[in-house]
Amino acid sequence: MAQEIDLSALKELEREAILQVLYRDQAVQNTEEERTRKLKTHLQHLRWKGAKNTDWEHKEKCCARCQQVLGFLLHRGAVCRGCSHRVCAQCRVFLRGTHAWKCTVCFEDRNVKIKTGEWFYEERAKKFPTGGKHETVGGQLLQSYQKLSKISVVPPTPPPVSESQCSRSPGRLQEFGQFRGFNKSVENLFLSLATHVKKLSKSQNDMTSEKHLLATGPRQCVGQTERRSQSDTAVNVTTRKVSAPDILKPLNQEDPKCSTNPILKQQNLPSSPAPSTIFSGGFRHGSLISIDSTCTEMGNFDNANVTGEIEFAIHYCFKTHSLEICIKACKNLAYGEEKKKKCNPYVKTYLLPDRSSQGKRKTGVQRNTVDPTFQETLKYQVAPAQLVTRQLQVSVWHLGTLARRVFLGEVIIPLATWDFEDSTTQSFRWHPLRAKAEKYEDSVPQSNGELTVRAKLVLPSRPRKLQEAQEGTDQPSLHGQLCLVVLGAKNLPVRPDGTLNSFVKGCLTLPDQQKLRLKSPVLRKQACPQWKHSFVFSGVTPAQLRQSSLELTVWDQALFGMNDRLLGGTRLGSKGDTAVGGDACSLSKLQWQKVLSSPNLWTDMTLVLH
């Protein structure tokens, strides 16, 4: 047990100076806890993906991570030594410098322990079982300060006024007495506020901990108990921040999310400034790219009565190919939690049809307000040719307890009809929020880029005498080869850094539902890859190909065993691509028929990815 630190010998101003440092230390700890929470959330998503196995018939024959069906003789998979689950070859991650491997979940769990430092506390608990919970010096000082003070919140005392200064004039003495009375009333106000907030926090944490006990095992309940004990300290620190603005002023200047000077400057600007002043230094540039929106995109969120409007502006720089969405404010939003009259809004954007985590941008969360002010600029790197195929989705969400999301409304803007060169379209506008549509109507054919390929049906030639002898008789079709050369792709949805680790998958589906799959090598860090890779499908006849379909998909290889991102795909065959309109479907049929009708000749095609 650590020894308690005695602060009774310090003066009031010295305590406040120490308290300022403790608040900064607490802010650093909160940032570290947020980083740890994101790592554990990503690990939990991987575990949930492996748990979503509804195919009970093939329960013992599927990979425990990606649910891919395993074979009896080939591709049987292997058992992970960490979790004792059978996984396929694609769900294994080899450790650096060794031949040992782990599954994606065990490897991610190992990385989380390394990055968060949990391995150190586990080893310490083995050597010192009665060591207790880790406690920093800053936490000990905060506890000593709380026990020393009679009230939970102590505002900073003003500079001392000498009696000689007060005795010079009776007005000074009267003013000094009123100032002391005002300080006393402020102390009483923050005392009642801190006590009330602390009671609400304890009751809310007790309710969430009871729900968590029913849903999780005993191992996770221990972590929830520790988190609940930390929440009381967080509430006390938050109330102190409100009560001592002078102390926390240097801390707010260090944190860009808490800075208010740019906002005050921007409010003095006219309502419709010129485009050159809209995207100036008055806004925080950049955005947050997180990994915890998988549940919301799958429909796992709550809905509120959509009300209110959002104000933003759109600007595109043709030199840097940068699309900037400047989110200014919202008004008259609905409450995310109607019973508690609570709303913690934030804004999230996508460039449809890309809904991946790399294509998401979002602002910071504004607490307890239905009229938030964001003043943030979200950026995308998009080529001008891709703007006509994109739609900007701007949605507003409420962040509740336990990371629960509530949908508050959205705005869909087709960029094909947006005039980026007109100065009036670059000024701020209010857009009414609408409910989430079940299916977005595409005003323009959406495209994820273009894929250039060459195809040829290779058939063996017959001798002339045998061909003349078999004319007019029913003869079996010759087995040939379908050769496909994947040349390259362009206008693909790239990552935030402007690169891709792309590869192509080809799948030929025969009439008997047999599937022939091939894959190209990965080209790393190229926005416009040029593979020039050949796919050869052997043992097929022209009669089979007339009733078959060829599906080509372009993927972006993920890192650290995560799921690869689908960039787009297209389909050639008798049925065409059913995911697009009638014109594109008929075009794919004509291209497929042209390949089959001209054997032993190359046919160049440019396919649009959807």
From Swiss-Prot:
Pfam family, any one: FYVE_2
Keywords for the protein's UniProt record, in alphabetical order: Membrane, Repeat
All residue ranges annotated as the RabBD domain in the record: 4-123
GO function term, MF aspect, one: calcium-dependent phospholipid binding
Keyword Amino-acid biosynthesis assigned: no
Gene Ontology biological process terms in this record: exocytosis; intracellular protein transport
Ranges for region Disordered: 219-239
Mode of membrane association: Peripheral membrane protein
Subunit structure, interactors included: Monomer. Binds NRXN1. Binds RAB27A that has been activated by GTP-binding via its N-terminus.
Name the UniProt record assigns to this protein: Synaptotagmin-like protein 3
Organism lineage string: Eukaryota, Metazoa, Chordata, Craniata, Vertebrata
This protein's encoding gene: SYTL3
